């Protein structure tokens, strides 16, 4: 299948042509795809001939619906793209934090030792996620380790979700507090060592984080 006709098939699916017929006009599709109406008509005929859509004319206009073959193609494409994009790693850029990491790591240190099996360095490595779109896209298939919250000196500390990761062979964990102030583009990483020193990192350096 040509890439351009694939884009048209995706467009038809987004317009609702799965499980029902929809009315389309060549003029509307030509604007959406930035091609001539004649080109859209030719692509529709190609999709019909290849068995990806049903197409017929009516008084209302051109009616189209994806066939089972067309739906299966998009499902397969989605699976392949998801595997490529969300395969358990993060590419990011080292940034400076807001200075609260050391305090919180010290408070949770006994529980981190119990649930993750290492004594954490009192601080976090902050990484701005460049790929995939958000930290949650990379972690969507990983199972978190829940570090339970607690109360100390009248102050409540909430649950923390931890995901085991590896950076250049060093084991650590991405931690996501239930009361985080960070946007989904920021990953906070704890480890048994100071990662900036161990990996000779500075702000702006690129890192690859493997979810394990």
Curated annotation (Swiss-Prot):
It comes from the Archaea. Keywords: Flavoprotein, FMN, Kinase, Magnesium, Metal-binding, Nucleotide-binding, Transferase. Pfam families: CTP-dep_RFKase (PF01982), MarR_2 (PF12802). One of its GO terms (biological process) is FMN biosynthetic process. Pathway: Cofactor biosynthesis; FMN biosynthesis; FMN from riboflavin (CTP route): step 1/1. GO terms for molecular function: DNA-binding transcription factor activity; magnesium ion binding; nucleotide binding; riboflavin kinase activity. This is Riboflavin kinase. FMN binds at residues 180, 188. Residues 88-212 are annotated as: Riboflavin kinase. Catalyzes the CTP-dependent phosphorylation of riboflavin (vitamin B2) to form flavin mononucleotide (FMN). It is an enzyme of class 2 (transferase). Residues 1-87 are annotated as: H-T-H motif-like. Belongs to the archaeal riboflavin kinase family. InterPro entries: HTH_MarR-typ (IPR000835), RibK_CTP-dep (IPR039063), Riboflavin_kinase_archaeal (IPR023470), Riboflavin_kinase_CTP-dep (IPR023602), Riboflavin_kinase_dom_sf (IPR023465), WH-like_DNA-bd_sf (IPR036388), WH_DNA-bd_sf (IPR036390). It catalyses: riboflavin + CTP = CDP + FMN + H(+). CDP binds at residues 97-102, 193-196.
């Amino acid at each position: 299948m040509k890439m351009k006709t694939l884009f048209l098939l995706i467009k038809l699916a987004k317009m609702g042509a799965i499980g029902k017929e929809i009315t389309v006009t060549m003029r509307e599709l030509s604007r959406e795809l930035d091609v001539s109406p004649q080109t859209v008509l030719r692509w529709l005929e190609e999709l019909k001939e290849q068995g990806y859509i049903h197409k017929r004319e009516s008084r209302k206009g051109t009616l189209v619906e994806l066939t089972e073959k067309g739906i299966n193609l998009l499902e397969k494409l989605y699976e392949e793209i998801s595997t490529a994009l969300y395969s358990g790693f993060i590419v990011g850029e080292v940034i400076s934090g807001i200075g609260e990491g050391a305090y919180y790591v010290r408070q949770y240190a006994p529980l981190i030792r119990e649930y993750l099996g290492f004594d954490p360095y009192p601080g976090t490595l902050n990484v701005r996620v460049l790929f995939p779109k958000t930290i949650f896209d990379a972690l969507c298939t990983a199972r978190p380790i829940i570090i339970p919250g607690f109360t100390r000196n009248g102050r409540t500390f909430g649950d923390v979700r931890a995901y085991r990761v590896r950076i250049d062979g060093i084991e650590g964990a991405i931690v996501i507090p239930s009361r985080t102030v960070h946007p989904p583009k920021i990953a906070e990483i704890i480890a048994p060592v100071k990662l900036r020193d161990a990996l000779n990192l500075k702000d702006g350096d690129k890192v690859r984080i493997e979810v394990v």
